[in-house]
């Protein structure tokens, strides 16, 4: 390229050039021909001086600012003749020499930058692949060493493959047993057994012992052993089931699988006792429940637990049981093997329902809820105090009875011994129905009855056993 020559009509400005003074001197030395009207010369000179001062102050700052913004490209600017404008001269400054700028130079520079970037990227990629290849080879070698296990049997070495199916003999050239001896006779190889057990695997020797193969029959034997073990386990479970008693047969005396299909034991001696028989109400000659009374089948005696049972021949179980003790499961199934030694309750009724009249489990409760019996017991309890009070009043004194009711009317046919012996209480009435329905309405008869009653009261007070009744 040719060096750039300065134009006659413009001055060239570069970034590194000092502050130019050539335009100002040129303007000073320039001869201005006054071709204007005389009365406008002052105005012309005034505008000219203002433009020069503005160029010195403002234009230089703007030029330096623009040059600093375009520092990377080293763009060269040209100034007009009067110094009032700047424009690109399409010339590049490279290494101090001025070159004419063109689009081809820019395109070549961009292409060179792209090629350099691609070269750097390819080099970095190649380096990374090289490092990864080294890592892969190291890991592969480690895995290969980890997969290949070497075993020594005597003086021979065997290598196991990755599948652990074969053991291949490793040839050892330096081994004294591989080559012939000085006398020309081969060294005798060490003895290798036909079967080798390594861990849980068994290997069989083939040929002269150069290769050991995992025994294919070992898996068959393992599966056969597992099958035998499983069959023995099932047989033990069947025996354990047969040792258990059938709940239906023990509790109700019959089972739907009584034809031999039931896996549980049907023992007639373990059948539950008939509750109707205990109450004296069972008249069935073919009753499926037992009528034999033994402690293993009998429930607890409720009167004995309250301390009220005096029957020496009571068929129920007489055992002191804790009130908060649970109910015996064996008894609920029909037979408790512990009998009188059992410290649990032998009862079919729900203790919570008996105590409170309701059960939180509701229909899910497996115990019996005697609804009718609970109502009857409640009524009986409400009637008990009135009966006790009536007996006490009757046996202690008769003044209260006479004061609260009408005069008693006795049958003439009954004797005093029968009345006081309480054998003819049916003839005693406390109401007024029979008194009003009597045959005699004579007041004399009433007076005789009242006098007789007073004599009877005095005699009764003398002979009544008050201390015994209290």
UniProtKB/Swiss-Prot annotation:
Note the effect listed for residue 346 to Y: No effect on RNA-binding and ribonuclease activities
Which InterPro entries does the entry mention?
A: Znf_CCCH
Q: Which organism is it from?
A: Arabidopsis thaliana
User: How changing residue 318 to Y affects the protein?
Assistant: No effect on RNA-binding and ribonuclease activities
Query: Which function does this protein serve?
Result: Possesses RNA-binding and ribonuclease activities in vitro.
Q: What is this protein called?
A: Zinc finger CCCH domain-containing protein 7
Q: Locations of Polar residues compositional bias?
A: 131-142
Q: What class of enzyme is it?
A: hydrolase
- State one molecular function term (GO): zinc ion binding
The effect annotated for residue 263 to T is: Loss of RNA binding and reduction of ribonuclease activity
Q: What is the lineage of its organism?
A: Eukaryota, Viridiplantae, Streptophyta, Embryophyta, Tracheophyta
């Amino acid at each position: 390229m040719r060096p750039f020559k300065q134009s006659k009509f413009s001055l060239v400005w570069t970034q590194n050039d000092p502050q130019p003074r050539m335009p100002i001197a040129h303007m000073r030395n320039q001869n201005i021909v006054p071709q204007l009207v005389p009365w406008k010369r002052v105005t012309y000179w005034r505008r000219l001086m203002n433009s020069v001062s503005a160029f010195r102050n403002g234009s230089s700052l703007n030029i330096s600012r623009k040059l600093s913004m375009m520092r990377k490209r080293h763009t060269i600017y040209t100034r007009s003749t009067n110094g009032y404008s700047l424009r690109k001269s399409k010339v590049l400054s490279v290494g101090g020499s001025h070159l004419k700028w063109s689009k081809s130079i820019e395109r070549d520079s961009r292409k060179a930058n792209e090629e350099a970037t691609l070269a750097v990227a390819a080099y970095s990629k190649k380096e990374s692949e090289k490092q990864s290849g080294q890592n892969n080879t190291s890991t592969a070698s480690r895995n290969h060493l980890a997969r290949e296990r070497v075993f020594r049997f005597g003086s021979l070495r065997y290598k196991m493959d990755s599948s652990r199916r074969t053991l291949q003999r490793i040839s050892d050239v330096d081994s004294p047993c591989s080559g012939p001896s000085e006398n020309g006779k081969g060294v005798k190889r060490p003895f290798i057994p036909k079967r080798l057990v390594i861990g849980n695997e068994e290997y069989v020797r083939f040929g002269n012992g150069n290769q050991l193969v995992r025994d294919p029959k070992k898996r068959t034997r393992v599966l056969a052993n597992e099958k035998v073990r499983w069959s023995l386990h099932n047989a033990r479970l069947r025996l354990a089931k047969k040792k258990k008693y059938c709940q239906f047969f023990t509790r109700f005396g019959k089972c739907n699988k009584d034809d031999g299909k039931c896996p549980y034991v049907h023992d007639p001696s373990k059948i539950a006792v008939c509750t109707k028989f205990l109450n004296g109400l069972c008249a069935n000659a073919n009753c499926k429940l037992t009528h034999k009374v033994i402690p293993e089948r009998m429930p607890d005696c409720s009167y004995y637990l309250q301390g009220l049972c005096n029957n020496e021949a009571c068929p129920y179980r007489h055992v002191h049981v804790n009130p908060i003790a649970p109910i015996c499961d064996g008894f609920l199934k029909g037979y408790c093997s512990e009998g009188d030694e059992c410290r649990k309750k032998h009862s079919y009724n729900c203790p919570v329902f008996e105590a409170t009249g309701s059960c939180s489990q509701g229909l899910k409760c497996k115990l019996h809820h005697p609804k009718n019996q609970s109502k009857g017991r409640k009524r009986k309890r409400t009637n008990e105090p009135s009966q006790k009070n009536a007996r006490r009043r009757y046996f202690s004194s008769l003044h209260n009875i006479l004061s609260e009711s009408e005069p008693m009317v006795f049958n003439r046919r009954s004797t005093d011994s029968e009345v006081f012996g309480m054998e003819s209480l049916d003839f005693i009435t406390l109401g007024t129905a029979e008194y009003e329905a009597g045959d005699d309405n004579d007041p004399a008869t009433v007076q005789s009855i009242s006098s007789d009653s007073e004599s009877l009261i005095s005699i009764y007070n003398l002979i009544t056993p008050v201390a015994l009744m209290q």
